[in-house]
């Protein structure tokens, strides 16, 4: 008879450990599908693995679903990622991340759809305000400590929008402007901030 696990019992267990396969086998096919396909802004509770419901909120400069008034909670709008990167100070990024994490705890938010780690490829980029810099190393350093601060307070960061995503019009329909770049450029520049956010900051998710 297979051992039954709760998701809390596997906290900190290596991703490659076979116990994860045993945990997943406790889900029905519908539960497994729903966990992926119905995961916008949170995930449902699953009793068979004692998984609680989670709540995620959007906004690289704070939880904007509160700022824009979709509920009655109050929230802080922090300086944009670009402004934070212009300080060239990883500790400021870390402090902002901590503040976002503390606020997330107060609002009972588990995950943060941010920060944004794409590069400023063009001054006309539709989401430049969400991203740090045109330099991959600077963006990666600031992003990593932004993420680390939030994570240390218990809020998981979902870094976005991977990768080379700087055209807003038609971006989800496949009708936007195409980008041309070499694999070397993609790896050394555009993916560098995401790599650093994971390796240095401990980011748990990508968008």
Annotate the PLM regions:
Residues 1-207:
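Glycoside hydrolase catalytic-domain context in secreted enzymes
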């Amino acid at each position: 008879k297979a051992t039954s696990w709760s998701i809390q019992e596997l906290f900190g267990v290596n991703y490659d450990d076979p116990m994860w396969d045993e945990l997943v086998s406790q889900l029905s096919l519908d539960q497994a599908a729903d966990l992926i396909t119905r995961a916008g802004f949170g995930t449902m509770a699953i009793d068979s693995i004692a998984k609680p419901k989670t709540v995620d909120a959007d906004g690289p400069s704070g939880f904007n679903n509160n700022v824009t008034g979709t509920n009655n909670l109050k929230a802080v709008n922090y300086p944009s990622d670009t402004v934070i990167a212009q300080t060239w100070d990883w500790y400021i990024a870390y402090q902002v991340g901590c503040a976002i994490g503390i606020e997330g705890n107060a609002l009972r938010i588990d995950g943060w759809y941010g920060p944004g780690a794409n590069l400023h490829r063009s001054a006309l980029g539709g989401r430049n305000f969400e991203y740090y810099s045109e330099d991959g190393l600077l963006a990666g350093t600031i992003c990593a400590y932004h993420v680390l601060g939030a994570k240390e307070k218990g809020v998981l960061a979902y870094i976005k929008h991977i990768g080379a995503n700087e055209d807003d019009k038609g971006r989800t329909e496949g009708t936007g402007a195409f980008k041309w770049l070499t694999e070397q450029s993609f790896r050394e520049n555009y993916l560098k901030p995401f790599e650093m956010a994971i390796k240095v900051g401990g980011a748990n998710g990508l968008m």
